[in-house]
Swiss-Prot record:
Pathway: Cofactor biosynthesis; pyridoxine 5'-phosphate biosynthesis; pyridoxine 5'-phosphate from D-erythrose 4-phosphate: step 4/5
Span of the signal peptide: none
Protein name listed in UniProt: 4-hydroxythreonine-4-phosphate dehydrogenase
EC numbers, comma separated: 1.1.1.262
NCBIfam families: pdxA (TIGR00557), PRK05312.1 (NF003699)
BP-aspect Gene Ontology terms: pyridoxal phosphate biosynthetic process; pyridoxine biosynthetic process
Gene that specifies this protein: pdxA
Gene Ontology CC entries for this record: cytoplasm
Species this protein is from: Ruegeria sp. (strain TM1040)
Similarity remark: Belongs to the PdxA family.
Self-association state and partner proteins as the record states: Homodimer.
Lineage of producing organism: Bacteria, Pseudomonadati, Pseudomonadota, Alphaproteobacteria, Rhodobacterales
Length: 326
């Protein structure tokens, strides 16, 4: 991303969760080499840490060494750690919108989002989206995105996400999987700088169906789709048995894996690097990362929150911004 300041916009997320405290902890570690501007109500920040208002993300380059750069918003509700106040819903939503506006206008290089509490947004503002990602897709004007979980050890995309396991075979159609593969390939090229990304695709069933003995989807259409897309230039392999795809030697043979359902994708990455996994949304017209955890109401304000995932999300956003192809 040339010509734009390499400053990340960080939306505040749910103020009653751990978002504000891990933002400050991330600033403590990143202030010198990964500047970001926190978008939220400064009253929600830990009182002992310095912050300074900014009116443009580029100002963070001068401010960050001494204070957390803040794009100040005023929230309506009170904040008690661990207890979401629906009156703050409009402020949380505005923080996300402001982050998107800063990135799409070229004033910030990428967007990182702290965790939200969906019920509070529904109760307080009639939030009409299944989640954070769908809201960002609407703001970005796109119909389809994919979720990638990334760490130093693994990049993995679940082809289906928050649906019952019993519904996966119905949702997982050839058109759906083709779209997931296409968006993953494009994201690896455009946002990760890979010129010819290697993608490994798992099977749906145990042992990738074992020739039809343990399921039909692989033989009926998954293998045929992979072969068809190979002829179109995609560097795909599979369908692989998922239980042998995530050990170290196997991971060396691909740049990203596509798994068929939520747990098939998330168990390996959380086993390999639980604290440093990053959620990346591919398919948006801007870079978006987020920490791979929720609001953690149970530990908010107790000095127990681990900022590692947010730190990695900010670092990855910066790296992606430097390598992104327009």
């Amino acid at each position: 991303m040339t010509g734009a300041p390499q400053v990340i916009a960080l939306s505040c997320g749910e103020p009653a969760g751990i978002g504000p405290e891990i933002a400050v902890a991330a600033w403590d570690q990143l202030r010198a080499d990964c500047p970001f501007v926190w978008i939220g109500d400064p009253r929600h920040l830990p009182s002992s840490h310095p912050w300074q208002p900014v009116s443009a993300p580029a100002e963070a380059l001068q401010v960050s060494a001494d204070a957390l750069p803040v794009w100040p918003l005023e929230f309506a509700g009170n904040t008690t750690k661990g207890e979401a106040d629906p009156q703050n819903a409009s402020g949380v939503i505005q923080s996300i919108k402001t982050g998107v506006e800063l990135v799409t206008s070229g004033k910030a290089a990428a967007l990182c989002t702290a965790p939200i509490h969906k019920k509070a947004l529904i109760d307080g503002a009639g939030f009409a989206y299944p989640g954070h990602t769908e809201f960002l897709a609407a703001l970005g004007g796109v119909d389809h995105v994919v979720m990638m979980l990334a760490s130093a050890a693994l990049r993995v995309v679940p082809a289906t996400i928050h649906i019952p396991l019993s519904a996966v075979p119905e949702v997982l159609t050839p058109d759906h999987l083709r779209r997931v593969i296409t968006l993953t390939d494009r994201g690896l090229r455009d946002q990760f700088g890979l010129t010819a990304p290697r993608i490994a695709v798992t099977g749906l069933n145990p042992h990738a169906g074992e020739g039809g003995a343990m399921g039909q989807e692989e033989g009926d259409w998954i293998e045929a789709l992979i072969r068809e897309m190979q002829t179109e230039g995609y560097r795909l392999t599979g369908p692989h048995p998922a239980d042998t795809l995530f050990h170290a030697a196997a991971r060396a043979r691909y740049d990203a894996a596509i798994a068929m359902y939520h747990d098939q994708a998330l168990i390996p990455i959380k086993t390999l690097d639980f604290d440093k996994g990053v959620n990346v949304t591919l398919g948006l017209p801007f870079i978006r990362t987020s920490p791979d955890h929720g609001t953690a109401f149970d530990i908010a304000g107790k000095g127990l929150a681990n900022p590692s995932s947010l730190i990695e999300a900010l670092r990855l956003a910066q790296t992606m911004a430097k390598t992104r192809q327009p």
